[in-house]
Amino acid sequence: MMARIDYADPSKASERTRDILAKNRNANIFRMMSHSSDYFVQYCRLGGAIRSRGELDPIVRELAITRTGILCEAPYEVIAHKRIGKNVGITDEQNEALANWQAAKCFTETQRAALAFTDEIVKLNKPTDATFKAIAAKLTPAALVELQLSVGFYIMTSKFLETFEIDLQPVTEVVG
């Protein structure tokens, strides 16, 4: 597979854009996104907040993000976030079970509620009342907002990856 348009040339980018690309290991997604340096900078700012700030449990966050990638059929996203998930404490069993999480026994009640919430956001555009109430009973309002924004952000990211047909890279090259 080859991307639908050429990746941006980092040597022609602003210093700020080059710095952000370097911090993100010049991953193909970021090289493509850097065609629009203003959007790229803001995308990375929000992505950084999602991944390193807030109170949402990182395991719940990464399960939801990886599940979003699965549902959006974005292999790049799935591969990257399974590795990120492993780095925050997701087990191999959990990563392997995500495609059919409903039948798996390796998720906590909170994780299952978050995965149901994720599925319905992606598939139905919004969760049903029952699903919303189930996750709202488990999370603080801040963590609930963070979960929804994480899913929404990674729907956008998955669609970006697939629209431009971003080339897969060895995960060890793009995720620490």
Indicate where each model-derived feature is located.
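Hydrophobic alpha-helical segments
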Residues: 1-176
